[in-house]
Amino acid sequence: MDLQLKGRKAIVTGASKGIGLRIAQTLAGEGVDVAICARTAADVEKAAAGLRSQGVQAFGDAVNVADGGAYTAWLESAVERLGGLDIFVHNVTASPATPGLAGWDLAYRTDILGAVNGVDTLTKHLRKSTAAAIVFIASISGVMSKVLPAPGAYAYGASKAALISYGAQISKDLAKVGIRVNIVSPGPIYFEGGPWDRVKARAPQMLEAAKESCVIGRLGEPQDIANAVVFFASPVSGFTVGQNLHVDGGFMQHVAF
């Protein structure tokens, strides 16, 4: 199937490793030019170099999305350097390992305000696209309690719930100006350096319990999420608006009407 993505332009946040990197790589594999950001310069440049090796225009910068002024300035610069914008993937998230009020503040500024700043800054550019798409990366933690055993799990889950609600609400208005908004909510996704990797080191029995809860018989991989995101980003999903897709290997037990 031709996803009709070749030559399009995308911004992916939090894309130096894990899910974000795999999303950027999968977009690049479809011929999409990609701008990425994350907090660590060396990781960003390594990721961007890998994307360029896929034969597309790609660049990245060290940006803290929680710093709204710096982030919005980078977004404007990224659009200019890309020469336009078709796809915005808000993937960045605050670490659920941050406890207490600091974790709540970081989750609010990164997950929620990061999405708001991204949408507010990029809407005028996306409106110029013939097939504009926004994809938020949330989590099944936004609709379930105590999915991830981490000190900042409460803030993490609440911020993802807010992100799901925000995405669903703006999807109705932005669709009227040609911008589709959808949400992907991952279940337990394992990758080196990720939250479930930390669970494996600290409490391997919890990792095994999560694996057993996935009826498909394994934890997810970043590629599982990237596949869903790239579908939502493509014109092939042009009749899909405001959806929250659970990609969780059957982890959730309730019926999602």
PLM regions and their residue ranges:
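Short C-terminal tail/terminal secondary-structure segment
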Residues: 6, 230, 241-257
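Conserved glycine-rich cofactor-binding loop
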Residues: 16-18
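The beta1-alpha1 cofactor-binding region of Rossmann-like NAD(H)/NADP(H)-dependent oxidoreductases
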Residues: 42, 62-74, 223-224
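A glycine/serine/threonine-rich, flexible loop-to-helix segment
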Residues: 53, 176, 186-214, 254-257
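Catalytic Tyr-X3-Lys loop
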Residues: 94, 101-120, 135, 163, ...
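Catalytic loop of short-chain dehydrogenase/reductase
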Residues: 94-99, 135-162, 167-176, 188-189
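Amphipathic alpha-helical dimer-interface segment in Rossmann-like NAD(P)H-dependent oxidoreductases
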Residues: 110-130, 142, 171-172, 176, ...
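Short, small/polar-rich loop/turn modules that mediate ligand/substrate recognition or access, typified
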Residues: 175, 180, 240-242
